Amino acid sequence: TGRVWTEDELKKTVEICKKYDKWIICDEIHCDLIRRGVTFTPIMNVAPEYADRIVVCTAPSKTFNLAGMKTSNIVIHNKELQKKWKDYVNGSLSMDGASALGMTAMIAAYTEGEEWLEQLKDYLDGNFAYIDEYLKKYLPKAHLVKAEGTYLAWLDLNGYVDRDEKKLEELMQKKAKVALDEGYIFGEEGRGFERINVASPRSVIEECMNRIRTAFEEEKLV
């Protein structure tokens, strides 16, 4: 959803897991892509005393578009679990580590990519703002769920389709001819929503929004 959990929310989550003796697997893959004015808090900073029951997953793939390098990090403090994980990776998965090229790309991204990343954040913020203004101007019953992190925008179109996901899916794919993530695939609460990747050139975002608007107008929804 693009929500960045606050320190208090993380603390409450850790307390619940402590109470019921549960592990925490925390996917922080989008942690570098945070909106201006929003603070990301690593879960390890909140509960270092619970580190033996926490697994943190990160990767440069989302932020730096390096998914093809197949390089990621899994931080496991618990020595027993660490050994089990290594045995599983080396045995069952037949993987013995990242490739030399992947490691080099990851190091370069994290050590030399700050200026590029700051420019990317500005560009993403601009794309979010463009979609927000477009909806207000042309599709006023829809609204953008403002993401605190990630490059994924949620469009709430229930003002036009009233949670009818099949109608919305047909509008998007057959009328507008755009392939977004249908909200309902993420659960019942996602009905009537579409998820759009805004890490795209502005021209692509403009074309997408224009197609959606045209489809809604042709169906006499606007």
Please report, for each region that a protein language model flagged, where it lies by residue.
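PLP-dependent class I/II
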Residues: 1-222
